[in-house]
Amino acid sequence: MDQAVILSTARTAIGKAFRGSFNDTDAPTLASHAIKASIKKSGVDPDEIEDVIMGAAVQQGTQGYNIGRLSAIASGLPTQVPGMSVDRQCASGLMAIAIGAKQIACKEMDIVVGGGVESISLVQNEFSNKYKSQDRFLLNNKPDIYMSMIETAETVSKRYGIKRDIQDEYALQSQHRTAAAQTQGYFNDEIVTVK
């Protein structure tokens, strides 16, 4: 089994859903900025890339229709480079990277682009596809299958006795750490400009 390594990383800044600077940016376009920057930093010849695996939790709108393939084309990769989409909700991007690593470790591929993209502003709005979006059999037999992330968090919190004030304290600590890291320039090499 081969060892998979990450040659380079890149990402866009995080925007504010519905009111930020990316609120009308299509998902393939958003992903392309990070993909192009990562490929450039890696020094890999785009012709050598064997797959683009992208994760997205809400695969509709411009995030639908195989976001991996759309991101590859938007990034200017050769048309022979295929793409693949992964939906594992919040872990979609991480799972895409893991799948790419497994392809390399199992000697199925040599060079893979993996990552995630989400444009909440363009998929969770008044135009979201909610028409018959839940299976009746599942609703009748396993009604919690469509539980939202917020409901899941509440359930986990109650089950394990994690109080709200402790969660808030942890979240605030995380925000402080992020702000400090940004101030100290720790993210400067990985965040790419989107114009």
Feature map (PLM): residue ranges:
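Conserved "HGTGT" condensation-loop signature of ketosynthase/thiolase-family condensing enzymes
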Residues: M1-V81, V117-K195
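Claisen-condensing/thiolase-fold acyl-transfer catalytic domains that form or cleave C-C bonds
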Residues: Q59, N66, L70-I73, L77, ...
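Hydrophobic alpha-helical hairpins/lids featuring a short glycine-rich hinge
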Residues: M95-F127
